[in-house]
């Protein structure tokens, strides 16, 4: 769940350190968060994230299930419209993801198949 924690930390007060001990490549997600304006960096098995008041919209690419979900969550709090590409990853792990977010009041639209 590191990508979701990183998305939350990106707009939380203070500095957070999120550790990934199993799949270090999962932290590649941090680069996509930086596209959204996050103040974040990786240091080995750790992501260090300093919270900022607002993320910015940008096109981002999902590399796996969790990264996709984290990018969608970050996009929901970003200023403007964020396009998350390669969402087929999300489909593999989260049933009715968009529909569930819509039911919670999210402004989200799935474009294409």
UniProtKB/Swiss-Prot annotation:
Keyword Phosphoprotein among record annotations: no
Native source species: Mycolicibacterium fortuitum
Involved pathway(s): Cell wall biogenesis; peptidoglycan biosynthesis
Cellular component terms per the entry's GO annotation: cytoplasm
Catalytic activity annotation: phosphoenolpyruvate + UDP-N-acetyl-alpha-D-glucosamine = UDP-N-acetyl-3-O-(1-carboxyvinyl)-alpha-D-glucosamine + phosphate
Role of this protein: Cell wall formation. Adds enolpyruvyl to UDP-N-acetylglucosamine.
UniProt protein name: UDP-N-acetylglucosamine 1-carboxyvinyltransferase
Broad enzyme group: transferase
